[in-house]
Amino acid sequence: MTKSELIEKLATRQSQLSAKEVESAIKEMLEQMATTLEGGDRIEIRGFGSFSLHYRAPRTGRNPKTGTSVELEGKYVPHFKPGKELRERVDAINS
C-alpha cells in the first residue's frame, strides 16, 4: 500500500474528513515520526510496534559493478520492531 492509497482508504472510511484533511494528518504524523527519530528518540505505538535507530558499524563493502572493495562509514539506520498484536495478526495469515 502506498501513501496515496492509505490516504484514499482512510478518507473513504472517515467520511466526515476530506481527502485533503486526511492527507494533511498523514503527512504531519510522518513528519513528527521522522523528527523524533532524527532527534535520536524511540517511537512506540502499542500493539503495532516500535521505531528506533540502530547503529551499523563501519565495514568493507563491494561495488557490485566493479567488484572493488569500498570502505563504508558507520551510520544509524531506522529499525522497526513489530508489536505482539501485529505479529499475532500476521501469524494468523500463515495458520
From Swiss-Prot:
Q: Which InterPro entries match?
A: Hist_DNA-bd, Histone-like_DNA-bd_CS, IHF-like_DNA-bd_dom_sf, IHF_beta
Q: Does the keyword Transport apply?
A: no
Q: Which UniProt keywords apply?
A: DNA recombination, DNA-binding, Transcription, Transcription regulation, Translation regulation
Example of a GO biological process term:
regulation of translation
Q: Which domain of life is it from?
A: Bacteria
The cross-references to Gene3D superfamilies, in alphabetical order and at most eight, read:
IHF-like DNA-binding proteins (4.10.520.10)
- Offer one Pfam family short name for this entry: Bac_DNA_binding
Give the molecular function GO annotations.
DNA binding; structural constituent of chromatin
> Where is it found, in Gene Ontology cellular component terms?
chromosome; cytosol
Subunit description: Heterodimer of an alpha and a beta chain.
Q: Which NCBIfam families match?
A: hip, PRK00199.1
Family of this protein: Belongs to the bacterial histone-like protein family.
According to its UniProt entry, the function of this protein is described as: This protein is one of the two subunits of integration host factor, a specific DNA-binding protein that functions in genetic recombination as well as in transcriptional and translational control.
Q: What is this protein called?
A: Integration host factor subunit beta
Species in which this protein is naturally found: Shewanella loihica (strain ATCC BAA-1088 / PV-4)
